[in-house]
């Protein structure tokens, strides 16, 4: 099963695209290291206080895939300098 989430994030402490890249790199590295998922920035590359991630995992069941995505969302929430604003999850 493939589980996919689109996550829009507001970055409070960013004052430039360089700050944004630094924070996103930390989040991306942590998610990939801890959960072994794939993710990419999908939108708002030119805005320094907003971004949209796509997060994908492949698992043997929908339940496991959903658990992994939920763990990823909790991990994103752990970063105090960002706020998740919109989240959509799909299981296929």
Question: Which sequence ranges carry the predicted segments?
Answer:
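C-terminal structural segments of small proteins and small subunits
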Residues: 57-92
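Absolute protein N-terminus
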Residues: 1-2, 92
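A short linear hydrophobic-aromatic micro-motif
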Residues: 37-43, 84-87
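A generic structural motif
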Residues: 11-16, 59-61
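Short, charge-patterned binding micro-sites
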Residues: 2, 40-61
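Short glycine-/aliphatic-rich beta-strand segments at the starts of folded cytosolic domains
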Residues: 3-13
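C-terminal binding/interaction regions
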Residues: 20
């Amino acid at each position: 099963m493939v589980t996919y989430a689109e996550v829009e994030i507001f970055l409070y402490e960013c004052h430039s695209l360089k700050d944004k890249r630094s924070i996103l790199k930390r989040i991306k590295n942590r998610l990939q290291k801890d959960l072994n998922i794939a993710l990419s920035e999908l939108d708002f590359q030119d805005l320094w206080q907003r971004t949209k991630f796509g997060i994908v995992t492949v698992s043997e069941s929908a339940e496991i895939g959903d658990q992994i995505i939920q763990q990823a969302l909790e991990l994103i929430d752990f970063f105090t300098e960002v706020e998740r604003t919109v989240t959509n999850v799909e299981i296929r």
